[in-house]
Amino acid sequence: MVSKRLQAQNFGDSMSATEPAGGQQERSLGDEIVGRIDELAAVSEAPQHLTRMFLTKQHRAAADLILGWMRSAGMRAHLDAIGNVCGRYEGEAAGSPCLMLGSHYDTVRDAGKWDGPLGLITAISCVAELQKKGRRLPFAVEVIGFADEEGVRFASTLLGSRAVAGTFDERLLGAKDSAGISMRDALSQFGLDPNHIGAAARARGELLGYIELHIEQGPVLEAQGLPVGVVTAIAG
């Protein structure tokens, strides 16, 4: 969990830049992460603020942008049937269990740009560093951008992670948004097959763990002057 104070600073300052032989300073990892967060924040349904709801045109544009970043980082990447953006960087042995990293890429109305993309984009940049250095780990690394956490459009939260956990309730496909469009129809318009959502579920043996870098949405770290904290329990 990253404190508000660290966000308010130039995030790039917290990650050192390197100085190549030619003397021209390379862009730091922090600068790259912040630049991509800004680029993703520009993909919005409203020009005055950030709104990117599940299965909208802007949501699809964001998914395509993230897919491109994953592939540039050396990952095989695809959309699953609920719209999660999934990338995999193989370990030393193909088919190894994975450590999963990521966050969500949908937003609430008038959202903050760090909520979700910080964890997702930082994870992609970490994998890109592994690729750049030619390193493979004893396990695979998977990065996932959950399609829906906020539940704004269909009044049902955590749809992306429910699909991965194997707890997605197919009755939700009949839920309708404010325009009367069902989730099933919205998925089809997005280019996905709602009949295959069950295939997004992951078996326990495939996953070593899940790590998500996230902004602090409270005052504790800021009040104590701490840049980061480790979450040991969560409600919900």
What is the role of each PLM region?
Residues 7-10:
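Charged/polar low-complexity intrinsically disordered segments
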Residues 17-56:
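N-terminal capping segment at the start of a domain
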Residues 42-90:
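A non-catalytic alpha/beta surface segment that caps or lines the substrate-entry region
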Residues 73, 85-118:
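Catalytic-core environment of secreted peptidases
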Residues 94-99, 136-141, 205-208:
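Short coil/turn connectors at secondary-structure junctions
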Residues 101, 111-149:
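Alpha-helical metal-binding/catalytic segments enriched in His/Glu/Asp
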Residues 148-149, 153-236:
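Midchain, well-structured core segments that form catalytic/ion-binding scaffolds
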